[in-house]
């Protein structure tokens, strides 16, 4: 299978509209075509070290749309349901609030929608490649952070199990410990 076919067959639930969300037009900045890249668009497309996950939502979106896959509720509302990734038991400390995490500055000359069939100037291809690289780097950072948090929680769980096992053995073998059962 050629790499271009792999990229075309890549499906991700990030780019699928949810119920009630507006569907974007094929030429708009929010369409999935912006994220699908051929080998000519970006030479780094062969180097997909990490698969796209639902942490990698589109970075360019109106403020009316929200990325439900990466939302966490603020610490001020613990009584409501907390949306956390699988395996995470503690709510992470938020680095960004609102849309600050996925707003990217665009130059004033950047058109909102290109006419169908028209190629953007060379400088805009570079800008698009930079935006895509930034998104992939953000994905890698999110995955690293998620793995770090999971590893930290697993280490904490191991410590608690070791303490529990020690107390269990101490309670069951208390008589032997008190009588001074010598070295074996």
Swiss-Prot record:
Keywords: Apoptosis. Pfam families: BMF. It comes from the Eukaryota. InterPro entries: BMF (IPR028192). The keyword Flavoprotein does not apply. GO terms for biological process: anoikis; cellular response to UV; negative regulation of autophagy; positive regulation of apoptotic process; positive regulation of protein-containing complex assembly; positive regulation of release of cytochrome c from mitochondria. Residues 67-75 are annotated as: Interaction with DLC2. The keyword Transmembrane helix does not apply. GO terms for cellular component: cytosol; mitochondrial outer membrane; myosin complex; plasma membrane. A motif (BH3) lies at residues 133-147. Isoform 1 is mainly expressed in B-lymphoid cells. Isoform 2 and isoform 3 are mainly expressed in B-CLL and normal B-cells. Coiled coil: none annotated. May play a role in apoptosis. Isoform 1 seems to be the main initiator. Belongs to the Bcl-2 family. Interacts with MCL1, BCL2, BCL2L1/BCL-Xl, BCL2A1 and BCL2L2/BCL-w. Interacts with the myosin V actin motor complex through its binding to DLC2. This is Bcl-2-modifying factor. It comes from Homo sapiens. The gene is BMF.
């Amino acid at each position: 299978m050629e790499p271009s076919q792999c990229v075309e067959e890549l499906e991700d639930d990030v780019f699928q509209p949810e119920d009630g969300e507006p569907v974007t037009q094929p030429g708009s900045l929010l369409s999935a075509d912006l994220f699908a890249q051929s080998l000519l668009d970006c030479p780094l497309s062969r180097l997909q070290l990490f698969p796209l996950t639902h942490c990698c939502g589109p970075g360019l979106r109106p403020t009316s749309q929200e990325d439900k896959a990466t939302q966490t509720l603020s610490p001020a509302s613990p009584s409501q349901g907390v949306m956390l990734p699988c395996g995470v038991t503690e709510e992470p400390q938020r680095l960004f609030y609102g849309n600050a995490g996925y707003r990217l500055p665009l130059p004033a000359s950047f058109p909102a929608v290109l006419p169908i069939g028209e190629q953007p100037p060379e400088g805009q291809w570079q800008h698009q490649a930079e935006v895509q690289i930034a998104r992939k780097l953000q994905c890698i950072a999110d995955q690293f952070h998620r793995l770090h948090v999971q590893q930290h929680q697993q280490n904490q769980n191991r410590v608690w199990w070791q303490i529990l096992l020690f107390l269990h053995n101490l309670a069951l073998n208390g008589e032997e410990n008190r009588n001074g059962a010598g070295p074996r």
